[in-house]
Swiss-Prot record:
GO CC term (a single one): plasma membrane
Record's catalysed reaction(s): di-trans,octa-cis-undecaprenyl diphospho-N-acetyl-alpha-D-muramoyl-L-alanyl-D-glutamyl-meso-2,6-diaminopimeloyl-D-alanyl-D-alanine + UDP-N-acetyl-alpha-D-glucosamine = di-trans,octa-cis-undecaprenyl diphospho-[N-acetyl-alpha-D-glucosaminyl-(1->4)]-N-acetyl-alpha-D-muramoyl-L-alanyl-D-glutamyl-meso-2,6-diaminopimeloyl-D-alanyl-D-alanine + UDP + H(+)
Binding-site list for UDP-N-acetyl-alpha-D-glucosamine: 41-43, 160, 197, 231, 327
Major localisation: membrane
Record organism: Mycobacterium avium (strain 104)
Descriptive protein name: UDP-N-acetylglucosamine--N-acetylmuramyl-(pentapeptide) pyrophosphoryl-undecaprenol N-acetylglucosamine transferase
InterPro entries attached to this UniProt entry: GlcNAc_MurG, Glyco_trans_28_C, GlycoTrans_28_N
Amino acid sequence: MNDTVKKPTGGRGDDPLPAGAALSAVAPHEPVSVVLAGGGTAGHVEPAMAVADALKALDPNVRITSLGTARGLETRLVPERGYDLELITPVPLPRKPTGDLARLPSRVWRAVRETRAVLHAVDADVVIGFGGYVALPAYLAARGVSPRKPRVPVVIHEANASAGLANRVGARTAQRVLSAVADCGLPGAEVVGVPVREAITSLDRAAVRAEARRHFGFADDARVLLVFGGSQGAASLNRAVSGAAAQLAAAGVSVLHAHGPKNTLDLREPQPGDPPYVAVPYLDRMDLAYAAADLVICRSGAMTVAEVSAVGLPAIYVPLPIGNGEQRLNALPVVNAGGGMVVADADLTPELVAREVAGLVGDPPRLAAMTTAAARVGHPDAARRVAQAALDIGRTARRARGATGGRP
């Protein structure tokens, strides 16, 4: 593995081939080459990195390349995890299909050419796509446009309860379509859950709780509320929870609040004897944050719901009030199972926070039941299942290419 970040090549990779050139004969026993297409937000990058780790666990010799753009979180997250990153041109995507693909912006086709060069350069056997503006060029490049140009098999993973444009396009020709939940809008999708990194899926909250609470400065017997709104925080969560600080303190609730690097909290001066209200811009150790908490207030992006349910943490989900309502849909399986509740963003007030949090943390049997229900909804083996599907397809593709002396 290496941590190289490579800039867009404009259609010619580090080992460029002329457009449509055939590859030389392929050795079928060489390591499988996997290209991960998931960039932009943490919701696309983190599942891709979880699958990358699972690929390495299943086959230490596998070759992994991530696709991304210079504007996405992948420029930091992928090298930090030790994987190679190839950058392509960022392209805007409409939220819904708008007609023939030929009418997509010219930048899409530039990104397709760049992606095709990457597939040639790394001798790709399979592409795993996670949706978003990095995945669409990968799906189109993997198809090829003539018998002389490469066709690379594709595995798609859809994390949201309602599939986006890129995955709807890619699913038409993908070899396998995997999803977080049933009825995501992709025909034939197999439910595997959302890939989550092993540090989270293997977390034993009870075993680590004392260490985690010491890490954040809480008493061993504290009742702890965790609050976070994604990598950039959430203003409405910040206002509602910080506004309830006095009532939470009176109820004996300690708070661990990640407010976002660009935000601040308007907190009152603590009174003598108040439980701690720990406010931080960002949480680098989410595993310890989950272990320290009894309850969480958070958004309901697919990755957030997957992690929170994987560790069995009761939650008050506050869906982001934009898009097609997919965040609310993401939360419904765990909520319907009894592992959490949904509060509309417009209804989230300091009074509601104080009332609901005090009621939940003051009712240990209810919290225990919610913990069990949340954990039952989680899919701790999702990353392994996605990785295994890709390896099976990639190995088959490599054997076929070895038998025919190149691309089929």
